[in-house]
Structure formats: structure tokens, C-alpha cells
Amino acid sequence: MKRIFLFILTNIAVVAVLGIVASLLGVNRFLTANGLNLSALLGFALIMGFGGAIISLLISKPVAKWSAGVRIINDAQNADEAWIVETVRKLADKAQIGMPEVGIFEGAPNAFATGAFKNSSLVAVSTGLLQGMTREEIEAVIGHEIAHVANGDMVTMTLIQGVMNTFVVFLSRVIGYAVDSFLRRGSDNNSGPGIGYYVSTIVLDIVLGFAAAIVVAWFSRHREFRADAGSAQLLGRKQPMMNALARLGGMQPGELPKAVEAMGITGGIGKWFATHPPIEERIAALQNAPA
């Protein structure tokens, strides 16, 4: 979850900064100088949309290291760290990707992988994960993160985020222009976009941005099932990943974690933005997957 949440958050920040810079440079005035130029707007939306997503991808490793406080293991300080590095190396070789950077961060059980390229990624695990799981379960979690890298999930999510960003930028400005034109009907002042355009665009950027985040989260949930299966394939068996998922959910295999039980009964908007499927669904998918 850290991996996708950080990517989405960074992407939103980058697109917002690009939008502010574009406004200061008079891009909005250019787009509406002689009516709304849809071709120019589409080009602008593509640059903004994919530019923000690609920049977010390229800076994902340093942002993740900084935000999570990751300590990179350059020289193992103990047997546990040496085992983690060797496990990552072994699974990376099986997945036929370059050796990732390996790191540890303080916190509750969690792990993530990130990076723009398969052969220069980062895999990090938390101290809570190392203290609360068996080595077999930790290996399964690392396999899950290696599978994300091998499957090119960060690049896939970048493309999806780029498409959604383009949609948000384009549609918000088309609607903003329509609202501004309606508010200024009969006015002789056509020197450029008015306050209606700017207010509408800002509001729609936020609203449509949330809608886009729901779509991105939906794709992310489906990639999690594939990464779970990838871990099972790398380890040659499904049970370690199932046990790790059960442990993360605070349950024994076959039982539902209390948090998921509550969410399943009441539903709510949180499910729409979740980047990971409920744990019991992931375990069931692994159980039903071919051996």
C-alpha cells in the first residue's frame, strides 16, 4: 500500500505544481484566446497528465526512502540483515531482474517495492515485519514485492495514472470554460478566462482527481492478486504467502480479520480508495489458483 499511496500522492503534488506554473505562464489565457482550442488543450492535458505521472515514477525511490525513513543495507550488520539481502538476491535471480536495493524501515508490519526500472528498484521491509513473521513468511512477502517489480507494476500504474491525469486536466478545463462562458454571457470582456473558469477548474481538478484515484486504486487491487500469485510461483508453493497474508490480517488461515469483517458489513467509501483487496479475498484467490 505504501508504494501506490506514495506514488498517487506524489503524482497529485507534481500535477498541482505543473498546473500552477502553467497558469503563471499564461497557458490558460492562450488556450482560450479565441474560444477553447481543443487540440491545444488535448496536447496540454497529455503533457500535464503523463508528465506528472512520469516525474512521480522517476522520483519514486528517493521519495519512498525519505518518507518511510528507509535505511539501505550496504553492509549487513547482523545475520538477519544478511539473510534479507540474500533472500532478495535469490528471488530477484529467479524473477530475472537486477538486484534491487534492500532497505529496512521502522514501523508496523509492512513492505514495499518501488523504482522506475526493473533492474534498479528498491525493496524495503519494516522492523515490525521482521519481528512478527517467520522467515518463510518474510520470504513470501519479499517474493510478493519482487513480483511487483518483475511484472512492471510501477510502469503500468504510471501509464494508468497518466491517462487519468489527462482526463482530469482536459475535462476540468472544458467544463470550466463552459461555466465561465455562461457566467459572462452578454459581456464585452473577452480578454481571457474569468474567475468562473479558474474556480471551476480548481474544483473540478479536485473532484475528478478523486474519481481518478478510485480508478487507479481499482487497477492496483487487481495487480495485488497477480503479485500474490507471483510470490507463490517464485517460492514454488502457495502456503507461505497465504500464511503471511493471514498473519498480516491478524488471523489464522480461514478466519476473517476483525477490521475486514467490519468493513465488509458496513461498506463505505474507504473500500473504493483501497489499493489492496481484503485479505480473505487474496487468500481465497491463492487457494483457488492452480498449483
UniProtKB/Swiss-Prot annotation:
InterPro entries: HtpX_protease, Pept_M48_protease_HtpX, Peptidase_M48. Binds 1 zinc ion per subunit. It is found in: Cell inner membrane. It comes from the Bacteria. This is Protease HtpX homolog. It is a multi-pass membrane protein. The keyword Lipid metabolism does not apply. GO terms for cellular component: plasma membrane. The active site is at 145.
